[in-house]
Design a protein with these regions (language model features):
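Conserved catalytic scaffold of divalent metal-dependent phosphoesterases
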Residues: 11, 66-162
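Beta-strand-turn-beta hairpins that frame and shape the catalytic cleft
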Residues: 1-4, 85-95, 131-137, 188-193, ...
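Active-site environment of divalent metal-dependent phosphoester hydrolases
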Residues: 10-15, 36-41, 64-71, 101-105, ...
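Conserved beta-sheet core of the metallophosphoesterase superfamily
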Residues: 49-53, 59, 146, 151-213
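Core catalytic region of metal-dependent phosphoesterases/phosphodiesterases
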Residues: 6, 11-88
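Active-site neighborhood of phospho(di)ester-bond hydrolases with catalytic His/Asp-centered motifs
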Residues: 5-7, 29-34, 58-64, 80-82, ...
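A short C-terminal boundary segment appended to hydrolase-like catalytic domains
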Residues: 132, 151-152, 214-229
Length: 229
């Protein structure tokens, strides 16, 4: 299964146009949040509309730059996985939207308890056995703390400790984050593969291949960071 991984488009739909032909060869698209530009939430809807036309199987969460109620709009386009479970080709997909409280200048900053709360709702819905999480894909705009995905320019780790704890406890197959543009990276926590594809607005994205299913364990057989043009 080929997976196209995007995040932080920030109201620049022309970047999707640059990937439109390539997107046809992917089975699904994972989007890690921030539809809107940093200072213009009105740019979120045009980007969402373009993303909906971009591929017929998109799974997404909102970011800290998106209005809190924008998740309802994303849900109207049948791609929101915040606080819920979606299923595709044997995979479970769940997500956490928004970013940690930091500057207070963006509309969707949330407490760590709120961020992981989206995923704890999923815990209540899924079977509680070790092997039941091998097929889980998590999309969390805010990256897990203390990884290659959450380091800002001064070297400080600004990710979510509770999202990290969730990953360590449940060991999902794949975790997609965004938010920290400079930390476009691939990492791991236990058996979980982690990726921050970087900002699509800056021309960054990632691709992955998932194998398994039909009675065989799922695995991320390859994952790679990419840059447009």
């Amino acid at each position: 299964m080929k997976v196209l991984i995007l995040s932080d488009g920030h109201g620049v739909p022309s970047r999707l146009d640059e990937l439109a032909d390539a997107a046809k060869s992917y089975d699904m698209v994972l989007y890690g949040g921030d539809f809107a530009a940093l200072v213009d939430t009105a740019t979120a809807l045009p980007f969402l509309e373009r993303l909906a036309a971009f591929h017929d199987r998109v799974f997404a969460v909102t970011g800290n730059c998106d209005e809190r109620d924008f998740r309802e709009t994303v849900d109207e386009y049948d791609m929101c996985v915040e606080g819920s479970l979606s299923y595709f080709s044997g995979l479970m997909l769940a997500g956490s939207g928004g970013g940690s409280k930091f500057t207070g200048l963006t509309p969707n900053e949330r407490s760590d308890e709120e961020l992981v709360g989206d995923l704890r709702l999923v815990e209540e819905s899924a079977a509680d056995s070790a092997d039941s999480w091998n097929n889980l894909v998590v999309i969390a705009h805010n990256p897990p703390h203390g990884t290659k995905l959450d380091t800002i320019a001064n070297g400080m780790h600004v990710g979510s400790p509770l999202i990290r704890s969730f990953i360590e406890a449940r060991q999902p197959l794949l975790v997609v984050s965004g938010h920290i543009h400079e930390s476009f990276a691939i990492d791991a926590l236990g058996s979980s593969t982690l990726v921050n594809p970087g900002s699509l607005a800056e021309g960054r994205y990632a691709v992955a291949e998932i194998t398994g299913g039909n009675g065989k364990p799922f695995a991320v057989s390859s994952i790679e960071l990419k840059t447009l043009g």
